[in-house]
């Protein structure tokens, strides 16, 4: 039995779904590192999808017929990250809460492009708090819709992408088909 099978066995997901889960989160898609195994990276991806990405998309699906919903996907790795990783002695990549360094006065060193990203994110957050619509100079953030399934990818450069472009539509559709975990 593979690592993935062992991890998913605890969720009472029937055997029919195991093959699909292994396909979506096959540890062979990832690289063993000094700090973590391929299984860890597969599990991390699964956890992020099950706990954050897919519930946000599912909630947007439920709420969007009644009011505007704005989803984002933060995927920027800070240029200073290699220095922090040396201190942490582990690769960090993009992790939950990474975007907060752009919103609040966190003592991290940003390059010029990251400063622009920070400025845009602050404008989005403050205009949303003020008006209920996230607006930033030169960047549109469309309301989420079932038909388009678009999110704003916060990165350098920023862009509006479909969940399928970032590999999440197929994953979230699968989890929606079996119900919330």
Language-model features, listed with the residues they occupy:
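Alpha/beta-hydrolase-fold serine-hydrolase catalytic core, especially in secreted/extracellular enzymes
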Residues: 39-40, 64-69, 77-78, 109-181
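Substrate-gating cap/lid region and adjacent catalytic-acid/histidine neighborhood
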Residues: 1-115, 124, 131
């Amino acid at each position: 039995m593979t690592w993935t099978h062992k991890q998913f066995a605890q969720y009472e997901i029937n055997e029919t779904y195991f093959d699909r889960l292994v396909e979506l989160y096959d540890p062979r898609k990832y690289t063993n590192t000094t700090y973590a195994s391929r299984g860890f990276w597969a599990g991390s991806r699964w956890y992020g999808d099950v706990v954050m990405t897919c519930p946000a998309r599912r909630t947007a699906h439920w709420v969007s017929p009644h009011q505007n919903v704005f989803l984002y996907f933060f995927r920027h790795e800070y240029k200073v990250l290699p220095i922090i990783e040396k201190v942490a002695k582990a690769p960090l990549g993009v992790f939950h809460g990474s975007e907060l360094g752009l919103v609040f006065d966190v003592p991290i060193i940003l390059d010029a492009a990251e400063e622009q990203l920070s400025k845009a994110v602050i404008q989005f957050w403050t205009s949303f708090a003020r008006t209920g619509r996230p607006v930033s100079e030169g960047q549109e953030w469309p309301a989420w819709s079932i038909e388009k399934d678009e999110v704003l990818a916060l990165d350098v450069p920023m862009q509006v992408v479909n969940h399928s472009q970032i590999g999440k539509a197929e994953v979230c559709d699968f989890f929606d088909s079996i119900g919330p975990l």
